[in-house]
Amino acid sequence: ISDELSGCLKRLLKIAEDSDGAFDPTIGKLIRLWDIGGENQKIPEEAEIKNVLKDSGYQKIFLDGNTVHMEEGCSLDLGAAGKGIGCDLILKELETKKDVTAALMNLGGSSVMTYGSKPDGSSWNVAVTDPRAENEDDYLGVVALNGTEFLSTSGDYEKYFIENGVRYHHIMDPSTGYPAESGVTGVTVV
């Protein structure tokens, strides 16, 4: 794999280790089983969940320089870190462009990256979505970004389905195989 991907995987595995598996990039099969936001989203059978979880676990992937070794059946899903990885690559490229001194980039609505100072010297102002608002133009507040910064928001309101009055969202708990039950609707990080 490339140096960039190797570095990304190394950081993700460190986060997995530091979080004792609460974040785990090896839940690819689990993500595909639920398919939340996809055409085949469903509440899987308990046996199906147990079956895919046996192939998960950040300890099942090993990096040796730019070579990845995974136990048979293990499957990666980098969705939780994809936009952050993308921002790192964009920043690296922008730093090589002498004619680009400032930029504001929207990376899919839930992530925004600023580069350099805004030409008029003011802050880049980014609205944070109100997860339970009826009108998608409603927001909780505005975050002022200065210089090169990255803001990312995620929550149980982005990709989900409701069945029998229960909200099933895309943020999975690798220890249970079900959507995480933290009581938190959304989180924004700068």
Over which residues does each language-model region extend?
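Mature catalytic core of soluble alpha/beta enzymes
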Residues: 1-190
